[in-house]
């Protein structure tokens, strides 16, 4: 199995806005739920390929990605209740999991899915 390329500053080529779910007033006494951008971070997006689950997801119009961001005070607050938006393309990704892969608080790896409602 080939080794994955390690993330570095040069590989963080995408600008991703991370959005948390918020509630607001709809003006008629009701509540509107939506997403509001919390911060923007550079990230690396790598399509997931190969296994049976990934192939099944593609057949349903969803593409899973691994998103890598630098670990910092803000990115450590990301949860699966959030969504990510590519600032360049406008594509929205549902966040499925956030993991500190190197356990040294250098990088956070997010499993995200394009084409699925957050």
Segments and roles (model prediction):
Residues 24-25, 30-118:
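Short, conserved turn/kink motifs that form compact alpha/beta structural patches or helix kinks used as
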Residues 1-31:
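Active-site-proximal polar cores
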């Amino acid at each position: 199995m080939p080794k994955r390329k390690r993330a570095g500053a040069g590989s963080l080529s995408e600008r991703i806005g991370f959005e948390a779910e918020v509630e607001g007033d709809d003006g008629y006494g009701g509540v509107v739920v939506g997403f509001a951008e919390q911060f923007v971070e550079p990230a690396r997006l790598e399509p997931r390929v190969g296994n049976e689950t990934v192939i099944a997801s593609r057949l349903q119009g969803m593409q899973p990605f691994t998103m890598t961001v630098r670990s910092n005070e803000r990115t450590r607050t990301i949860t699966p209740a959030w969504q990510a938006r590519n600032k360049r393309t406008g594509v929205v990704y549902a966040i499925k999991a956030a993991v500190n892969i190197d356990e040294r608080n250098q990088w956070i790896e997010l499993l995200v899915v394009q084409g699925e409602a957050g």
